Amino acid sequence: MNRSVAGRSVFASPACYQAFFDILSEACFRYGLMVHAYCLAHNQYHLPLKTPKGNLSRVMRHINGVYTQRYNHVNDTHGPLFKGRFKAVLVEPDDALLKLSQLIHNRPIAIKKPVVKHWVDYPWSSYPAYISKAAPLSWFSQDTLCNA
């Protein structure tokens, strides 16, 4: 999980969200990363991850660094986008992971000004893929939660 500096919008357009997904895809194949759920908001992202190679810091440095470089280049800006490195909490792959996924998927409707009325309507979340309303992205690992 990471939030932007000062609530700044870091996903201002569909192209920004897609660029982040492209970087996640690259990280999955390059570092063996497994993404069990995701939800991107305009100023933050949430990702329950598994790093079988024990390389979480390297993976997150890659994701945050590459996205920041691309964002700054496209928007002719400079400086950090995100507060600090990232926030990580160890979660066991059982009911706790399922509950975390539910909390993450609830983000777009649980905020003060909901972005959508129903989880399924939010395109920047893995929820539509879980309920077969959207095709899962090639790098997305939904097996762990489906078997929980």
Task: Show which residues each predicted segment covers.
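Short Pro-Cys-Gly-centered "Cys-loop" motif that presents a nucleophilic cysteine in a tight turn
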Residues: 1-38, 50-148
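Short Gly/Ser/Thr- and Asp/Glu-enriched loop/turn motifs at secondary-structure junctions
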Residues: 40-44
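A generic structural motif
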Residues: 45-49
